[in-house]
Amino acid sequence: MENETNEKLEIKGIPTHEGKYVEYNVLGNFFEVTSKYIPPIQPVGRGAYGMVCCATNSETKEEVAIKKIGNAFENRIDAKRTLREIKLLSHMDHENIIKIKDIVRPPDREEFNDVYIVYELMDTDLHQIIRSSQALTDDHCQYFLYQLLRGLKYVHSANVLHRDLKPSNLLLNANCDLKICDFGLARTTSEADFMTEYVVTRWYRAPELLLNCTEYTAAIDIWSVGCILMELIKREPLFPGRDYAQQLGLIIALLGSPEDSDLGFLRSDNARKYVKHLPRVPRHPFSQKFPDVSPLALDLAERMLVFDPAKRITVEDALNHPFLISLHEINEEPVCDSPFNFDFEQASLSEDDIKELIWNEALKFDPNTMK
């Protein structure tokens, strides 16, 4: 797959701390990494958290992506998100999940303010591909979906919900290999604080989250996969709601109004009343609304995009669906050896506690003691 070509910048580094570290000025952002990471250093992405640059590990000759999270411990929620991402990705080992290669420790522990996480380098993400003029065949859609489900099967087997699956969190390389990234919102079970913790993209959010359910299951990720599948096919978001109310309206416009038997997951009387008072919309099969789309792809999407989470297809059954028959191989779809332990979330961690835990995670990559 091709990505937009970016003009290369010549970014020179200044050695620091007796040459053990090098500092780069990347578009006004200071990047200080150990000297084993060598140029060319190039910016490859920017987000709310900071900047991502690519570099080469001189010891392994491997190209890597380095994410700098500036002032990582200023805000406890952000710091916990960083810790969660590091712990989860260190626990997981799967071809379709991005790998952490290193955590760059600062030269001085007392000045540990920025976190640099080193990942394997990918070329682009699914959001960029969908937006591009790159032709996408049925084979592309099948292969991307298969890899997403294969990775998600592993995630769910670790008793983890991703909770923020969307095209920009699915990284790709030139071979069309797909890897799930950004586990900062992942949880083992539902938590009420999710609703206020982050303004995550609502377009891929399941009805139970839009309706403030505090109990939800792995089915929330399956809903997101259904949205992503249809976006791959149509090259535009399926439910681009401006706000929660419009988001729910777009869902019902496509799926039809839910029956009473579909609302068992709603514990709140207010939520149930709200849904029941919405204008009634008849249900039409997807094949009527999308007559030019592969019937098998539509059938799978319809099984994912079900209002009642209990009736949504599971990741195992989705992998076994006829749309993916040419790729599905049960013995090549591993599960996680042990469930992920979220116990560290339960403690009321201070910013300094989180800093200590991230420092300890960094030590696992380079146990050589530094002050």
Swiss-Prot record:
One of its GO terms (biological process) is intracellular signal transduction. SMART domains: S_TKc. The active site is at residue 164. Its EC number is 2.7.11.24. ATP binds at residues 44-52, 67. Residues 38-324 form the Protein kinase domain. The modification Phosphotyrosine is found at residue 198. The modification Phosphothreonine is found at residue 196. Keywords: ATP-binding, Kinase, Nucleotide-binding, Phosphoprotein, Serine/threonine-protein kinase, Transferase. Dually phosphorylated on Thr-196 and Tyr-198, which activates the enzyme. Very low autophosphorylation, although dramatically increased when Mn(2+) is added to the reaction instead of Mg(2+). It comes from the Eukaryota. Its cofactor is Mg(2+). Belongs to the protein kinase superfamily. CMGC Ser/Thr protein kinase family. MAP kinase subfamily. The TXY motif contains the threonine and tyrosine residues whose phosphorylation activates the MAP kinases. This is Mitogen-activated protein kinase homolog NTF6. It comes from Nicotiana tabacum (Common tobacco). The gene is NTF6.
